[in-house]
Amino acid sequence: MPWIQIRINATAKTADKVSNMLLGRGAQPVTFMDAQDVPVYEPLPGETPLWGETEVMGLFDAETDPAPTIAFFQQIFGEDVGYKVEQLEDKDWVREWMDHFHPMQFGERLWICPSWRDVPNPDAVNVMLDPGLAFGTGTHPTTALCLQWLDGLDLAGKTVVDFGCGSGILGIAALKLGAARVIGIDIDPQAIQASHDNAERNGVAGQIELYLPADQPQDVEADVVVANILAGPLRELAPLIAGHGKPGSLMALSGVLESQAPELETIYGQWFDMDPTAVKEEWCRLSGRKHG
């Protein structure tokens, strides 16, 4: 059946309130969209990452009269509240979503493939990964930068720390590329579960250890450390992240905008000889080799 979509303009502070109001008026589901195409600056753990200007979108049955809902938001936020009402044609939305994702190649050897697609090269290093709740499918420039970096390493027999593991994509890729052991760390229990499920799907669950920050091992001496968690946490957690690598280990950081790269390069330069910065779109990857 067709649908009616109501978009309400919100701020980072009001987006959750608007979402709850739309749900209360019968929207199923509610989604968030960046209203100005600006990047999200990831906050520290416990904070909610949202854009400064956010569109909150509620999907309603076609028979729904949008006028009372619009009037409700005008009463709460004023007559000039930004909104848009759209009629959406009936589609197989699951199929539409699935059609958006295709196998992607990173570097020379590595492919990330949704489970419903044929593997383009059976002889390549193939990671089977479906989009889900946790961050990391290969479509975002930061993930792509890290995957390309991993593809260029000799990981045979190595221990890898994936700090902010999300979907587990980087750690799983490292294992498929020859690493012997991966330690994945994330603040989100959903990410830990997603990483576990994806590792099982790829036959590497026995080689990946997954921890919330409070449970992470303290005596790790990894050969490779990768952290794709954005600038704020990279800055605050720098001593911890750097400490996971043994002398001579390799490190890659991403989730960093070009404007943020110089500060982080200076911070991590205390422990690492830094490589030239890699840039994809407006995002950067910093990498280096640990002193000693």
UniProtKB/Swiss-Prot annotation:
Main EC class the enzyme belongs to: transferase
UniProt keyword Lyase present: no
A GO term, aspect molecular function: protein-lysine N-methyltransferase activity
CDD domains: AdoMet_MTases (cd02440)
Cell compartment(s), UniProt: Cytoplasm
Reactions performed catalytically: L-lysyl-[protein] + 3 S-adenosyl-L-methionine = N(6),N(6),N(6)-trimethyl-L-lysyl-[protein] + 3 S-adenosyl-L-homocysteine + 3 H(+)
Domain of life of the source: Bacteria
Keywords linked to the UniProt accession: Cytoplasm, Methyltransferase, S-adenosyl-L-methionine, Transferase
GO biological process, one term: methylation
Gene Ontology, cellular component aspect: cytosol
Pfam families: PrmA
UniProt cross-references to InterPro entries, sorted A to Z: Ribosomal_L11_MeTrfase_PrmA, Ribosomal_PrmA_MeTrfase, SAM-dependent_MTases_sf
Gene3D superfamilies in UniProt: Vaccinia Virus protein VP39 (3.40.50.150)
Enzyme Commission identifier(s): 2.1.1.-
HAMAP family per the UniProt record, alphabetical: Methyltr_PrmA
Family recorded in the similarity comment: Belongs to the methyltransferase superfamily. PrmA family.
Cited function: Methylates ribosomal protein L11.
Protein name as catalogued: Ribosomal protein L11 methyltransferase
